[in-house]
Regions:
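Polybasic/polar functional segments that serve as interface/processing modules
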Residues: 24-52, 58-66, 93, 99-101, ...
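Gly/Pro-enriched, hydrophobic low-complexity segments
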Residues: 127-209
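Bacterial N-terminal signal peptides
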Residues: 7-17
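Positively charged n-region of N-terminal signal peptides that target proteins for export
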Residues: 1-4
């Protein structure tokens, strides 16, 4: 469970950090960083494909997500089965179908939340913190498409991942996590929108612990 949670931490934090308004055109790393955290809320669909060395076919899941700068991440897997995950700065609640929810805190599992906090430093515009953890390789095309490859430089990240690659245009469209042991996770994000600008009452209720 810890590794799957880590993948979600990475996805959440990088999405929050690099979501940009629809009019923005990212041409270099500076312009990418300059547009951090422009939207209070980002919603969309996701498709996650987990490629494992032991299986010929990827394990695929789909659902919807809601990201809030002030509240955290609401990650709602719908297929192949329902999973509701709520992540805040210091708490995580996971609910499978009609089972009772399970909650962990940063105090109970500091290592898991360490990963989230590392990437959330980008959310605050702390590019120095990102460069402490990764070697950054950025490229952009005239069309506005861009790619950022993160190569971990130190433990514990470099003990798990070979590279983390983000690509997109005005938003992150794809996130790929390549592990040292050969496994790979690809997450595609579509239908991203930032309206309404605030969480609905139903969305806010999800973040009540």
């Amino acid at each position: 469970m810890r590794k799957s949670l880590f993948s979600l931490f990475v996805s959440m934090a990088l999405l929050v950090s690099f979501s940009t308004p629809s009019w923005a055109k990212v041409v270099d790393l500076d312009s990418l960083q300059a547009q951090l955290s422009q939207n209070e809320v980002v919603r969309g669909d996701f498709k996650q494909s987990r490629h494992l060395e032991m299986f010929n076919q990827p394990l695929t899941s789909t659902g919807i997500f809601t990201l809030s700068k002030s509240h955290g991440l609401l990650w709602q897997q719908q297929i192949p089965f329902a999973v509701n995950l709520v992540l805040t700065q210091d708490k995580l609640r996971q609910t499978f179908a009609n089972q009772a929810p399970k909650t962990i805190t940063a105090q109970e599992n500091p290592m898991a939340f360490y990963f989230s906090h590392v990437f959330l430093s980008v959310f605050h515009g702390d590019t120095a913190a990102l460069k402490e953890q990764f070697t950054l390789d950025f490229s952009a095309q005239d069309s506005g498409q861009w790619q950022l490859v993160l190569t971990p430089k130190q433990a514990p990240l470099n003990a798990v991942f070979k590279t983390i690659t983000l690509s997109g245009n005005t938003h992150i469209d794809q996130l790929m996590l390549e592990e040292l042991r050969g496994d790979k996770t690809e997450i595609e994000f579509t239908q991203q929108a930032s309206l309404p600008k605030e969480l609905t009452d139903a969305e806010k209720a999800q973040f009540d612990f």
